[in-house]
């Protein structure tokens, strides 16, 4: 449809903004999403109560506000992936002790799984392709229902040379990588677990 090129152009223009400007937009987005539109507030509230049954209502509301601030930051940071250099990305999102993986690979291990939580912006880890010697980076992902967003996220996640594996293909593809002795690091978050 003609809306897709407009949407992609909007993302690319916003990605040109410096991070400080994007974080101002994030603060505006926080107000719109949390206070005005109230996007999934009931669901977030239920999840918070279920996850933290011992916390007071005051503490739960504080966590709820923090969640929406993080969500707004996540949106603008992910948009920035469309126009960020590898050097800047690696300054902002880094892996502690990547040499541990290198050491194990030198001992003959070929495939590693990195399980990442939803802390910070794990989309930014796509720039990790150059952090592991002679290894390919694979990201397990769940295709999104909206094709425009799915295509956008796939392109952003693979921009720096990593490869995407659909969740439903994980077992088959990882077994193939292991059989072929491909030096690989597989990244997934808790929702991608098969």
Residue ranges of model-derived segments:
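Soluble catalytic domains of membrane acyltransferases
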Residues: 79-194
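N-terminal signal-anchor transmembrane helix
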Residues: 28-108
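Dinucleotide-binding Rossmann-like beta1-alpha1 core, especially the glycine-rich loop
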Residues: 7-12, 23-31
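Short, small-residue-biased leader/transition segments that mark boundaries at the very start
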Residues: 1-4
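Hydrophobic alpha-helical segments typical of transmembrane helices
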Residues: 9, 44-47, 125, 152-153
């Amino acid at each position: 449809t003609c809306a897709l090129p407009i949407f992609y152009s909007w993302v690319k223009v916003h990605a040109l903004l410096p991070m400080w400007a994007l974080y101002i937009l994030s603060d505006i987005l926080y107000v719109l999403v949390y206070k005005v539109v109230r996007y999934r507030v009931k669901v977030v509230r239920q999840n918070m109560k279920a996850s933290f049954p011992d916390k007071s209502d005051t503490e739960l509301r504080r966590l709820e506000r923090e969640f929406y601030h993080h969500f707004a930051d996540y949106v603008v940071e992910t948009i920035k992936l469309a126009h960020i250099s590898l050097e800047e990305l690696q300054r902002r999102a880094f892996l502690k002790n990547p040499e541990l993986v290198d050491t194990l690979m030198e001992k003959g291990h070929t495939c590693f799984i990195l399980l990442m939580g939803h802390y910070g912006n794990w989309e930014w880890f796509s720039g990790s392709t150059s952090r592991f010697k002679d290894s390919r980076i694979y990201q397990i992902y769940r295709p999104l229902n909206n094709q425009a967003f799915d295509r956008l996220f796939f392109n952003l996640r693979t921009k720096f040379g990593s490869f995407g594996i659909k969740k439903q293909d994980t077992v088959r593809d990882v077994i193939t990588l292991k059989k072929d002795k491909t030096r690989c690091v597989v990244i997934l978050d808790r929702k991608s677990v098969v």
